[in-house]
From Swiss-Prot:
Cited PROSITE patterns: GLYCOPROTEASE
Xref: CDD domains: ASKHA_NBD_TsaD_bac
Chain positions recorded as Fe cation binding sites: 111, 115, 297
Protein name as annotated: tRNA N6-adenosine threonylcarbamoyltransferase
Chief place where the protein resides: cytoplasm
Encoding gene, per UniProt annotation: tsaD
Catalyzed reactions: L-threonylcarbamoyladenylate + adenosine(37) in tRNA = N(6)-L-threonylcarbamoyladenosine(37) in tRNA + AMP + H(+)
Taxonomic classification: Bacteria, Bacillati, Bacillota, Clostridia, Thermoanaerobacterales
Cofactor: how bound: Binds 1 Fe(2+) ion per subunit.
Length: 333
């Protein structure tokens, strides 16, 4: 057996535990979602999320250890940022305790790096340099990746993240939280007949802006209450995907990567996946995105990223802290 890494993820509203061998073979992947709990409030409530993580993490670990001998674990990898500080501290405290008790290295993993590494759980042929678009509820980042752990941030959102925009538009349309999957489904029943604006920033670069799009949908809805929700959803989704794809295409032409990757919760969007495949065909660049189960927060991606840090000897001290605003590529130990 190769090196088995225990991954722990508690950065937001998903409590997850996973055991992954050699960064690729998922032996166990357990997850308990808090979506139903936070749906009552239309979004994640940090205090509730932290308390729920405390209730869920130990049963998940017990289940994992019933299926796999803990003495065969080579290291414990845990998300230490970015995310909700209280939620992060739950996973971090448990990971430190396990590292000490099992006498194995502790490895701190950046949550965004975890999303990127979700691709490498399944991609048998990672190629670099690569262009990576990470789209989630809290981030919209376009990244040039020269190799494992070598990142250059090309562009990011200057206001709302793409996933955040989905949820805010969902509230305008009276859709349940999280709105992203609902809008995706509704869009397949509607037509993108309304032309919502796509922000084109004046400065050079690859930054994104979605606040104007969100406002445009709200104003349109107020002025056109009779418009079909399915058509509004399809039109909004088309505009948002267009914004993501246009910047990615611009970077693709200028950076000439060997491969194109998509990551993060919004990577599950069917229209975005379709357009990324079209980009790959147009520019003859291979495209990879995670299977749906690894797009949203999970611990397998944390274990995968942790494995590569383990190979590099990047072990964290037991006084490792949580960093809610941790940047990709930023090292805090």
């Amino acid at each position: 057996m190769g090196k088995v890494i225990l991954g722990i993820e508690t950065s937001c509203d998903e409590t997850a535990v996973s055991l992954v061998e050699d960064g690729r073979k998922v032996l166990i992947s357990l997850l308990s979602s808090q979506v139903d709990l936070h749906r009552l409030y239309g979004g994640v409530v940090p205090e509730i999320a932290s308390r729920r993580h405390l209730e869920l993490i130990f049963p998940l670990l017990d289940e994992a250890f019933r299926k796999f001998p803990r003495e065969k674990i080579a290291a414990v990898a845990v998300t230490y940022g970015p995310g909700l500080v209280g939620a992060l501290l739950v996973g971090l405290s448990v990971a430190k305790s396990l590292s000490y008790a099992l006498n194995v290295p502790l490895i701190g993993v950046n949550h965004m790096e975890g999303h990127i590494f979700a691709n490498f759980l399944e991609d048998a042929n990672p190629v670099f340099p690569a262009l990576v678009l990470v789209v989630s509820g809290g981030h919209t980042d376009l990244i040039f990746m020269r190799g494992f752990g070598d990142y250059e941030l090309l562009g990011e959102t200057i206001d709302d993240a793409a996933g955040e925009c989905f949820d805010k538009v969902g509230r305008v349309l009276n859709l349940p939280y999280p709105a992203g999957p609902v809008i995706d489904r509704l869009s397949k029943k509607g037509k993108p007949i309304y032309k919502f604006p796509v922000a084109r920033l004046k400065e050079e670069g690859y930054n994104f802006s979605f606040s104007g799009l969100k406002t445009a949908v709200r104003v349109f809805r107020e002025k056109n209450p009779e418009a079909k929700v399915e058509d509004i959803a399809a039109s909004f989704q088309e505009a948002l995907v267009r914004a993501l794809v246009e910047n990615t295409e611009k970077a693709l032409k200028e950076c000439m990567p060997a491969k194109l990757y998509l990551a993060g919760g919004v990577a599950a969007n069917s229209r975005l996946r379709e357009e990324f495949l079209n980009l790959g065909k147009t520019y003859n660049v291979p495209v990879h995105f995670p299977s749906l189960q690894y797009c949203t927060d999970n611990a397998a991606m944390i274990a995968a990223a942790g494995y590569h840090r383990y190979l590099s000897g990047k072990y964290a001290p037991l006084n490792l802290n949580a960093y809610p605003s941790l940047m990709l590529g930023e090292e805090r130990y």
